[in-house]
Each structure stands twice: as structure tokens, then as C-alpha cells.
Amino acid sequence: GTIPCGESCVYIPCITSALGCSCKKKVCYKN
């Protein structure tokens, strides 16, 4: 929840979710 994964999730889910990233406030974050 603190580290940006450099990916947005406005229209599609986080592809980086495979790396443990999750969507928060239209941006993918890790931890």
C-alpha cells in the first residue's frame, strides 16, 4: 500500500497484482 508499482488501474485491473500489487486510488501499490 505504500510503494507505487508504476501502473494505473482506472480501466483495467493491476497486471502487477502478480507481483503483490493492489489497486488503491486508481493506482497500483505494493504493501
UniProtKB/Swiss-Prot annotation:
Belongs to the cyclotide family. Bracelet subfamily. The keyword Disulfide bond applies. The keyword Phosphoprotein does not apply. It holds the Pfam family Cyclotide. It comes from the Eukaryota. Probably participates in a plant defense mechanism. The lineage of its organism: Eukaryota, Viridiplantae, Streptophyta, Embryophyta, Tracheophyta. This is a cyclic peptide. There is a cross-link at G1-N31 (Cyclopeptide (Gly-Asn)). Disulfide bonds join C5-C21, C9-C23, C14-C28. It comes from Melicytus dentatus (Tree violet). Signal peptide: none annotated. This is Cyclotide mden-M. GO terms for biological process: defense response.
